[in-house]
């Protein structure tokens, strides 16, 4: 019986087609290797600098507290010294920002968003030392600020520094390494790699140019940053609240109610931040002496507040586990919440180098715990655990204020290692975001960036108008 055997020509055609298919598969990935290598460098540097920043802030705080402990038995020395030490530390931060790098003031995240759109400068040779040393001063003083804003801005500036050092001129590399550094910075601040990636994709979605090259670079940078962080700090979650019980299905409606509450609180909080910024601007009018003295007064008051009510001062990471454990009454939780709202507004809106993520997480924890404890009294048949509402509240305020629910959900779950609470987290954060949007609230960082750009345009217009007048005289 005759069998059909492929001819030599047919075999050659098959080999040729197979070769073309392999080449297409290989060539489909156009990611330049140089960008991925530089992303790894940026992530490593950001992780190292982020860890160094954390250690430096802790060292300053310990030195300040140690000095106060030495005079703890002498009230006539303790109170003035608490004010003076915190005031001096804060004044260092305010002075450096105002004198050398105004863009290093505040969180720094809006500056990175503006730089991604080529609307704001990236002067890494100024911002890196000013943000690092200035943040040591303000955070070390016990001001109500977080370290995530500085590490995000430091990471973005490290990305631009690497770009300049290795003389990479393409616009794609410039944009990609800036975004990579920012994502690595958030990961280094919170030991939350997935949240760092989502932060770039979600919060910076209008500015981030999503493609296969940029997203691979962001992944690479975040991986390296997280590895560096865990080498120095271990793999434990940075907020220890223990393993909480899951939320029964018949209690999920309470998380929606909590989300509605935060959906109302978020826009109000954003409005207060912006109005407080305007108030400070009217006070100092851009004059460096007034600005530094104002910052010193705020820092000194935080130092005094740290003696009176330690929970009301500082970034809030130490407060979160205590509050989530139900160690405070509902009334005390609400009192600390209101106090920390005021201190957060004063510290962040004054332009101090420091972030607002950590203070918002603490505020969300306080209000969420208060709601959970009240609900446990009103609905005893549910056997509610206030800590689960604390976790949901942590992400809800950030979701309503920053308008980044996915980032808020993942960030809190990574920080607390309570992934089983993902469903109530989704319900709370989504409810908060939708209601905040319905009420007309605007994302905080985008609003701050828009105000910064408007001020920049006004200054440029005034400069252009004054130039001809100077030439005619």
Curated annotation (Swiss-Prot):
Binding site for chloride: 107, 356-357, 445
Motif Selectivity filter part_1, chain ranges: 106-110
Disulphide bonds in the chain: none
Gene3D superfamilies cross-referenced by the UniProt entry: Clc chloride channel
Location in or out of the cell: Cell inner membrane
Motif Selectivity filter part_3 positions after renumbering to this chain: 355-359
Site (Mediates proton transfer from the outer aqueous phase to the interior of the protein) location in chain: 148
Key words of the record: Antiport, Cell inner membrane, Cell membrane, Chloride, Ion transport, Membrane, Transmembrane, Transmembrane helix, Transport
GO cellular component terms, A-Z: plasma membrane
Classification via NCBIfam families: PRK05277.1 (NF003640)
Family: Belongs to the chloride channel (TC 2.A.49) family. ClcA subfamily.
Protein name (record): H(+)/Cl(-) exchange transporter ClcA
Organism: Salmonella arizonae (strain ATCC BAA-731 / CDC346-86 / RSK2980)
